[in-house]
Amino acid sequence: SGLLINQPKYSWLKELGL
């Protein structure tokens, strides 16, 4: 994970710690 490509919006938000 960690990519914005093909990732659900909540997925990369959790990666940011939000």
Curated annotation (Swiss-Prot):
Keyword Ubl conjugation among UniProt keywords: no
GO molecular function ontology, one term from the record: aldehyde dehydrogenase (NAD+) activity
Keywords recorded for this protein, A-Z: NAD, Oxidoreductase
The keyword Methyltransferase appears for this protein: no
Catalytic activity: (S)-2-amino-6-oxohexanoate + NADP(+) + H2O = L-2-aminoadipate + NADPH + 2 H(+); (S)-2-amino-6-oxohexanoate + NAD(+) + H2O = L-2-aminoadipate + NADH + 2 H(+)
E.C. no: 1.2.1.31
UniProt record, GO biological process: aldehyde metabolic process
Enzyme class: oxidoreductase
Top-rank taxon: Eukaryota
pH behavior: Optimum pH is 9-10.
Protein family per UniProt: Belongs to the aldehyde dehydrogenase family.
Subunit structure: Homotetramer.
Entry protein name: Alpha-aminoadipic semialdehyde dehydrogenase
